[in-house]
Amino acid sequence: IVAAGGDYKKIRFTFQEYFRRMSSDPTRWSQPFAALLGAYSAQMGFGLPSIGGKDSMSGTFNDIDVPPTLVSFAVDVAKYGDIITPELKTPGNKLVRFSINKDDFDIPMYENVAELYGKIHELTENGTIVSAYALDSKGVAAAVAKMAFGNKLGVKIDDEVTTDDLFDNGLGDILAEIPADKMAALEEK
């Protein structure tokens, strides 16, 4: 949502869980507990509610269990003029990676994430960010390729960027396109 120009403070979550039938075996409770604890942690960390969901915790037929799954999506309402798309817009623009902080267990440090996402929203609203992509576990390389395909633009990657920089897990990070003439103002902030 943030990469599309939305305001993270207005996000509402929904969840649907699919887990094998619970029993007296305590190990069968660990997956739903861990998944829901993670969802709860994100809601509390951002200070945002879930507006609904459905649980399907009896996902077992005879001796066949469903794959353990927690599906989550989030919604936001915005004006159409505030929405941006991920494809690169203009040759000569720069790409900037906004990285979130995570703790030793790879859990987002929500105070930092909230501040960063607020700044990204502000930069999108004022036109500094013209396109953006929410990174996934595939990292920057996959994101750059997908952003470039849209308008058939290429990307030159600086020599200082390492292979690790290109392929490390980027969950939570945002890759943003910024016009070259707005980079100086961005660096001041």
For each predicted feature, which ranges?
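A glycine- and small/hydrophobic-rich beta-loop-beta segment
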Residues: 89, 94-100, 105-132
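A general structural motif
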Residues: 73-79, 109-117, 156-160
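C-terminal substrate/ligand-recognition segments
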Residues: 1-4, 8
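Glycine-/charge-enriched secondary-structure boundary and capping motifs
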Residues: 28, 32-42, 46, 51, ...
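Glycine-rich anion-binding loops of enzyme active sites
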Residues: 12-101
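Residue-level signal for inorganic ion chemistry
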Residues: 5, 92, 176
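A generic structural signal for short
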Residues: 14, 27-28, 108-109, 132-133
